[in-house]
Amino acid sequence: MDAVEFSKGHGTENDFVVLPDPEAALELTASKVAALCDRRAGIGADGVLRVAKAGKLLDAGVLDALPDGVASDDWFMDYRNGDGSIAEMCGNGVRVFAHYLAAAGWESRTDYVVGSRAGAKPVTVHSGDAVHGAVTVAMGLVRELGPSTASLAGWAYPGIGIDVGNPHLACVAADLSGDDLAKLDLTVPPGYDPDLFPQGVNIEFVTPLPTGAEPAVDMRVYERGVGETRSCGTGTVAAAAAVLHREGFRIAEDSGEVRVRVPGGAVSVRLAGGQAWLRGPSVLLAHGRLAGEWWLEH
């Protein structure tokens, strides 16, 4: 088998292996994804972004149907978690995906739609050279799922369930200092209510920062199928919605903007009328080829 091309990129240090596969010709199994994301025996990443046309993924049987708003000729982000499981959406991943298309010369438009399993995600590429990019992603509908609680190290953290195309439990802990937040042991999976989240959930721990021109928070996240990551795009949207909700914000009606700091950097989240937009950076740092023999072995 021929070598398989790849790139490596990250959005606020949420890192990905990018597989350019416009014809959806690669057999991308869970074991291959997990091997690629292995930080000792593979390239190492939080997840894999396959770059393909939506119609080709449909023809190959990767998709059973085109998601809402996604056309056959749209670029589609076939996103996989680091353990090989399929995920609906990744906000940081969409930024890296759109940046890659610009850097590779596959897409010259600055405004277009990226398909995902959570539906069509319009993007605006503000800048994108060979290394650095800045992208805004229209994240779509933000829906409140109701109050719930996460548990960690014997402590309960009240939060609110938020759907951003994938499920989140955002816990705003105003009494936690920045140092306290940094000391939380997220090597251990937090507990949650499986009745509310039967498919698992991404859990955010959020600390509001002193109010400036716009609300700002610090956030750490435990992603289902991955563990703690340096950033989570949909998680930052959930965190922003939760901290505004705590102040009386009506998710389906009001508008507001929050700057969210994560261990890997910072992004801006805007919410209006139940919709969200995420703006942040992207970095493409390496390109290479996977040995065909290694690919076949996994």
Q: Where does each model-flagged region fall?
A:
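Short, charged N-terminal helix-start/capping segments
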Residues: H10, G61-D64, S148-A153, Y157
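Glycine-rich, charged/polar anion/phosphate-binding loops
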Residues: L145-P147, G154-P158, P189-Y192, N202
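Short, solvent-exposed aromatic-acidic interface loops
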Residues: G140-V142, A266
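Internal active-site segments that recognize and position negatively charged phosphoryl groups
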Residues: A150-A182
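Non-cytosolic beta-sheet module surface loops
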Residues: L141, D163, V221-E223
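Short, solvent-exposed secondary-structure boundary/capping segments
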Residues: V131-G140
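A glycine-rich beta-to-alpha transition motif near the start of alpha/beta enzyme domains, typified by
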Residues: M1-V131, A170-H298
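Short, charged/polar, Gly/Pro-enriched secondary-structure boundary elements
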Residues: R143-P147, L285-H287
